[in-house]
Amino acid sequence: MAASLRHMAHFQKALLVAKTAPRLSTIVRATSTLNDGASKVPDHSMHFKLERLWAVGMLPILPASYFIHGPVMDAVLTVALTLHIHWGIHGVVYDYARPYVIGEAAAKAAHIGVYLITGLLLAGLLHFNTNDVGITKAFELVFSL
């Protein structure tokens, strides 16, 4: 009988805890429209179109840089290549270095790294253009081999 009373007391305590503890499967009612989630995501279609237009715009610059040498063409080619490479690397990092995949700190470091790489690329190309033969003359020298 004593064991039965102990079990009954234990059962009553468990029942009391179960009544006062929050439920894990509580139904939460939420009202939403269909476009609520979609409005929070930025639209990258315009950026994608701009990248494609930029790439198409680079098509005449590359052959022209073989025939036209000088600081202006070097600067145009430097800016065009730097932006094209930056957008490409940024797209890869944006797609594959998301915070929920690699962690918040690593994702932030990857995005900062994109801008560091772009800055170093721009500085290196500008240094090459001003202190050496320049990009267009370098292309001519490479193709003359």
Swiss-Prot record:
<feature type="topological domain" description="Mitochondrial matrix">
    <location>
        <begin position="95"/>
        <end position="108"/>
    </location>
</feature>
<keyword id="KW-0496">Mitochondrion</keyword>
<keyword id="KW-0999">Mitochondrion inner membrane</keyword>
<dbReference type="GO" id="GO:0006099">
    <property type="term" value="P:tricarboxylic acid cycle"/>
</dbReference>
<feature type="topological domain" description="Mitochondrial matrix">
    <location>
        <begin position="1"/>
        <end position="52"/>
    </location>
</feature>
<comment type="subunit">
    <text>Forms part of complex II containing four subunits: a flavoprotein (FP), an iron-sulfur protein (IP) and a cytochrome b composed of a large and a small subunit.</text>
</comment>
<dbReference type="InterPro" id="IPR007992">
    <property type="entry name" value="CybS"/>
</dbReference>
<dbReference type="GO" id="GO:0020037">
    <property type="term" value="F:heme binding"/>
</dbReference>
<keyword id="KW-0349">Heme</keyword>
<protein>
    <recommendedName>
        <fullName>Putative succinate dehydrogenase [ubiquinone] cytochrome b small subunit, mitochondrial</fullName>
    </recommendedName>
</protein>
<feature type="binding site" description="axial binding residue">
    <location>
        <position position="84"/>
    </location>
    <ligand>
        <name>heme</name>
    </ligand>
</feature>
<dbReference type="GO" id="GO:0046872">
    <property type="term" value="F:metal ion binding"/>
</dbReference>
<keyword id="KW-0816">Tricarboxylic acid cycle</keyword>
<keyword id="KW-0408">Iron</keyword>
<dbReference type="GO" id="GO:0006121">
    <property type="term" value="P:mitochondrial electron transport, succinate to ubiquinone"/>
</dbReference>
<dbReference type="GO" id="GO:0048039">
    <property type="term" value="F:ubiquinone binding"/>
</dbReference>
<feature type="topological domain" description="Mitochondrial intermembrane">
    <location>
        <begin position="70"/>
        <end position="75"/>
    </location>
</feature>
<dbReference type="GO" id="GO:0008177">
    <property type="term" value="F:succinate dehydrogenase (quinone) activity"/>
</dbReference>
<keyword id="KW-1133">Transmembrane helix</keyword>
<dbReference type="Pfam" id="PF05328">
    <property type="entry name" value="CybS"/>
</dbReference>
<dbReference type="GO" id="GO:0005743">
    <property type="term" value="C:mitochondrial inner membrane"/>
</dbReference>
<dbReference type="InterPro" id="IPR034804">
    <property type="entry name" value="SQR/QFR_C/D"/>
</dbReference>
<feature type="transmembrane region" description="Helical">
    <location>
        <begin position="76"/>
        <end position="94"/>
    </location>
</feature>
<keyword id="KW-0813">Transport</keyword>
<keyword id="KW-0249">Electron transport</keyword>
<feature type="topological domain" description="Mitochondrial intermembrane">
    <location>
        <begin position="130"/>
        <end position="145"/>
    </location>
</feature>
<comment type="similarity">
    <text>Belongs to the CybS family.</text>
</comment>
<feature type="transmembrane region" description="Helical">
    <location>
        <begin position="53"/>
        <end position="69"/>
    </location>
</feature>
<feature type="transmembrane region" description="Helical">
    <location>
        <begin position="109"/>
        <end position="129"/>
    </location>
</feature>
<keyword id="KW-0472">Membrane</keyword>
<dbReference type="GO" id="GO:0045273">
    <property type="term" value="C:respiratory chain complex II (succinate dehydrogenase)"/>
</dbReference>
<comment type="pathway">
    <text>Carbohydrate metabolism; tricarboxylic acid cycle.</text>
</comment>
<comment type="function">
    <text>Membrane-anchoring subunit of succinate dehydrogenase (SDH) that is involved in complex II of the mitochondrial electron transport chain and is responsible for transferring electrons from succinate to ubiquinone (coenzyme Q).</text>
</comment>
<feature type="binding site">
    <location>
        <position position="96"/>
    </location>
    <ligand>
        <name>a ubiquinone</name>
    </ligand>
</feature>
<keyword id="KW-0812">Transmembrane</keyword>
<keyword id="KW-0479">Metal-binding</keyword>
<keyword id="KW-0809">Transit peptide</keyword>
